[in-house]
């Protein structure tokens, strides 16, 4: 007879000393992702996962609360130093960076990776209020 081995449902958490933070900020939402130096995702959070819906996902407060949730997950993992990459023109950029500065994690670099077209596709019409 064959024995069936039980698989453990608990994942082993690996301590990550250096982390890469990617902040993708659009007008509708801000997504904050933490990866290790190889690009494997450790944790992520966004305005939508924090309970904000609709237009409130794009606010700086939603970005700040998502960032604070991610910081808590990073501190549990034992992360000490981080590199930050910021992408997009949204309002959550500055508040996310400010939250990381006050968190106690050592910021090694902040890089802006927003792509700018060399007269590519036509942008959408101007927003009407």
From Swiss-Prot:
Superkingdom per UniProt: Eukaryota
One Pfam family recorded for the sequence: Ribosomal_S11
PROSITE patterns membership: RIBOSOMAL_S11
Alphabetically ordered keywords of this record: Chloroplast, Plastid, Ribonucleoprotein, Ribosomal protein, RNA-binding, rRNA-binding
A cellular component term, taken from the record's GO annotations: chloroplast
Single annotated GO MF: rRNA binding
Keyword Hydrolase: no
Subcellular location: Plastid, Chloroplast
Keyword Ribosomal protein: yes
Gene3D superfamilies (UniProt xref): Ribosomal protein S11
Cited InterPro entries: Ribosomal_uS11, Ribosomal_uS11_bac-type, Ribosomal_uS11_CS, Ribosomal_uS11_sf
GO biological process: translation
Family (UniProt): Belongs to the universal ribosomal protein uS11 family.
Summary of subunit composition and partner proteins: Part of the 30S ribosomal subunit.
Name the record gives this protein: Small ribosomal subunit protein uS11c
The species this protein was found in: Cyanidium caldarium
Lineage: Eukaryota, Rhodophyta, Bangiophyceae, Cyanidiales, Cyanidiaceae
């Amino acid at each position: 007879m064959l024995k069936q081995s039980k698989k453990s449902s608990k994942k082993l958490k690996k301590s990550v000393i250096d982390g890469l933070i990617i902040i993708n900020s659009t007008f509708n939402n801000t997504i904050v992702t933490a990866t290790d130096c190889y690009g494997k995702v450790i944790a992520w959070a966004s305005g939508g996962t924090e309970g904000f819906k609709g237009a409130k996902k794009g606010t700086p407060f939603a970005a700040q609360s998502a960032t604070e949730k991610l910081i808590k997950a990073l501190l549990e993992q034992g992360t000490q130093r981080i590199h930050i990459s910021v992408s997009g023109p949204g309002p959550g950029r500055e508040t996310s960076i400010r939250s990381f500065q006050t968190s106690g994690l050592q910021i090694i670099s902040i890089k802006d990776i927003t792509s700018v077209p060399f007269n590519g596709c036509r942008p959408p019409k101007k927003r009407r209020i």
